[in-house]
Regions:
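Membrane transport/envelope proteins' first extracytoplasmic loop
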Residues: 2-313
């Protein structure tokens, strides 16, 4: 009888220990998950602001974009738009700091792949940016192992996006074959970095990040992209406008207009450009830039949900 009671007591204690161990493990998982969610939320919330700011380490994200969706402006029209915006600047608390024409074109990267022991060429959809002065929306090459090199200065050089370089095994000094329009040329990779339009690395409008080898972006000099696309010097299809400081803007996920001054400025610039240019143009702030907005929404969502998610776990 004593032996039987001892065995039953041992089994009962074992079950109790197992339950205690299971509960302890669940608590530990919840604590570590909560710490991870909180760390991510707080990190990304401040990180993007630091990247976008006008500093030695930032890119100086534009405050207003003017886009020609149907073609390009020549150098005279590009300069006229900037002059018109400056001359017609409204009476506002926001002051114009800079206006910079920019060229951005859809194109192709020609990627060599080996399949079944034979080499073939794969066409990868791409977006190419011509960045000359680069006072606004600069290419970002952080001091980190991920990135290296310098900006493109000659018309035969290119900076490749870090996700493209890692996914396609491209290194500094490599030559890449790219195209835009009917042109196809080879460019030397002199830098590996990022750009604000592609921090969320996906084709425009796609909610899913691009798989390696399916999308490419690169940052050439203005003359390099003009040479590639065979268009005249000084051509642009985007005007970047920088306002002194960092004005508030209307956040799409709220009912309130947090950036009334900037919204009024966007309307004024839209009217100015419409008077200068017959073709329709798009004028918008950062809330309409896909990569910028989806990352902001991600950071906002992380801050809102990490506490209840941790509680549910």
């Amino acid at each position: 009888m004593l032996v039987l009671l001892t065995k039953r007591l041992a089994r009962s204690l074992l079950r109790t220990k197992l339950r205690l161990a299971a509960v302890s493990a669940m608590v530990m998982v919840a604590v570590f998950a909560g710490i991870s969610f909180a760390a991510y939320a707080h990190t990304v919330s401040g990180m993007y602001d630091e990247i976008y700011e006008d500093s030695d380490q930032g890119v100086n994200l534009p405050d207003v974009w003017v886009e020609n969706p149907s073609g390009t402006w020549d150098a005279n029209m590009s300069n006229s738009i900037c002059e018109g915006i400056s001359n017609e600047w409204p009476d506002s608390s926001l002051a114009l700091n800079d206006c910079e024409p920019r060229l951005r074109l859809d194109g192709t990267m020609f990627l060599s792949v080996i399949e079944d022991e034979s080499e073939s060429e794969k066409l990868v959809p791409a977006v190419w940016h011509g960045i000359d002065e680069g006072r606004i929306d600069r290419v970002w090459i952080p001091e980190h192992d991920c990135c290296s090199g310098r900006l493109a200065s000659s018309d035969s050089e290119i900076v490749i996006d870090q996700r493209v370089a890692s996914g396609m095994e491209i290194e500094l000094g490599d030559n890449v074959s790219i195209g835009a329009g009917s042109g196809r040329m080879s460019f030397t990779v002199v830098g590996i970095g990022f750009q604000s339009n592609h921090l969320y690395f996906a084709p425009e409008g796609s909610l899913f990040p691009a798989e390696p080898g399916t999308f490419a972006t690169g940052y050439l000099s203005s003359s390099g992209l003009e040479r590639l696309a065979n268009i005249s010097s000084g051509s642009s299809n985007i005007i970047l406008i920088d306002v002194l400081g960092t004005p508030d803007y209307d956040i799409p996920t709220t009912d309130e207009d947090e950036g009334t001054d900037l919204s009024s400025l966007v309307s004024s610039i839209d009217e100015t450009v419409s008077n200068l240019e017959d073709n329709p143009s798009l004028v918008y702030d950062r809330s309409q830039v896909f990569s910028v907005e989806i990352l902001r929404a991600d950071a906002e969502g992380a801050m809102l949900f990490y506490v209840p998610v941790t509680g549910m776990i």
